[in-house]
Amino acid sequence: MNLTQIWKATLSALQTQTSRHDYEALLRPATLLSLDNGAAFIGVSSPGQKEGLENRLLMPLRNALARVVGYPVQVQVLIANLNSRTEPSPSLTLSNGSRLMSDPEPVVAETPAPALTPGNGTGERVVQLDLASAMRSGMLNPRYTFSSFIVGSSNRLAHAACLAVADNPGQAYNPLFLYGGVGLGKTHLLHAIGNRVLDRDPEINVLYVSSEKFTNDLINAIRRQQTEEFRMRYRNIDVLLIDDIQFIAGKDATQEEFFHTFNTLHSAAKHIVISSDRPPKAILTLEERLRSRFEWGLIVDVQPPDLETRTAILRAKAEQMSVHVPDEVIDFLAHKIQSNIRELEGSLNRVAAYAELNRAPITIETATAALADLLGNQRRRRISAEAILQIVSEHYGIEVEQLRARNRSRHVVVPRQVAMYLLREETESSLVDIGNLLGGRDHTTVMYGCEKIAEEINSDSRLRSEVMAIRERIQMLRG
């Protein structure tokens, strides 16, 4: 494996062990400069990133690297200058006389080999790298497009709304507010909007930014007495894509500035798309005037992917990686990893890296070994299909036998379809198994019931609450 492959496998392992914030802000922008005689040098772009890695993630990083390469590793974090372009060099010498060896195999274009420059006056040597990372600079990531987004019942409404905004910015759904748990594709959709807008009209001014970067830019502008420049930057754009807005809650100065930025853009028919991990009304300490503005347009819930969507995501990821993953392994991962897309893709990365390092075929046994720590944390007592039927029937106040009967009245049909959906999601039962369990129904009837519930929980808040309540009881029973 070359440096790029080692670092990719390391990030895949860390992706499921760290918070989204630490992964995106500290790990993802970093790069593996060299690995020689058990010494790994990690390049970062700022003192803050260096401090964050060293204080919070050094041990997990060291352990993940060691697992990938198969031997103990010492990690040193170096400040990198990401703004200047340098020609690749075969090696470089640090101030202590040790050498950083460049990758002996070809490296992707955005990570050419490093070269040293004189000190920056802080006593630190600076490694200059051309790492054209869109996420790092607040620009758009070209990999996040609508064509690379897997659409399923859990995100179909969000996808359609984002596509409508991208095709007609400044028109309907302004603002568009996306909310949902970590790793469900909200950031992907924000970037997809920006990329499509620019594909259609390169002259449109689009800005993607996290709420944390907005806050940091404001703080720096105040400190440098450049608030007018800050306002010029944020209020002279056509499409503002702001991620994780919940982090401005409780920050009075940031909320004040964003309030006026929002008003300026909205009154000029500029489009604003916002993401959050919760709906506006659930963001505590968010000013009421901002909350009301977020509710002016369309609010869309992004749900965790269902089994079929998880399977499609894994197949697309395997194709993107140019790795053959047998169907039974895809099914195994789709059933085991249910929380979010990021963990799902990260798990496939880990399995592929584990198989490559051990020169082993990708099998269920290989996947189980590669994900031993993750699956160990998720290990739960199995719950029987009969127990799920009992929980569903108790929730709706009917008998289990009514779920199996041919009764087609609505007060039984909906609970029966909910039972089909939960049996498909929470157990490894096939459609045929579920049909047999529910009075010998055809597998196509079961498929229809599952799809109907998966579709309706996106638009029917009452049904969504009922399914969530039943799922909570299932989790409690599992322990």
UniProtKB/Swiss-Prot annotation:
Residue segments, region Domain I, interacts with DnaA modulators: 1-71
Species: Chloroflexus aurantiacus (strain ATCC 29366 / DSM 635 / J-10-fl)
Protein name: Chromosomal replication initiator protein DnaA
Entry domain remark: Domain I is involved in oligomerization and binding regulators, domain II is flexibile and of varying length in different bacteria, domain III forms the AAA+ region, while domain IV binds dsDNA.
The entry's keywords: ATP-binding, Cytoplasm, DNA replication, DNA-binding, Lipid-binding, Nucleotide-binding
Cellular localisation: Cytoplasm
GO cellular component: cytoplasm; plasma membrane
Domain III, AAA+ region as annotated region, ranges: 139-355
Quaternary structure and partners: Oligomerizes as a right-handed, spiral filament on DNA at oriC.
Protein's GO biological process: DNA replication; DNA replication initiation; regulation of DNA replication
Main location: cytoplasm
Keyword Transferase among record annotations: no
Biased composition (Polar residues): 86-99
Region (Domain II): 71-138
Region (Disordered): 86-106
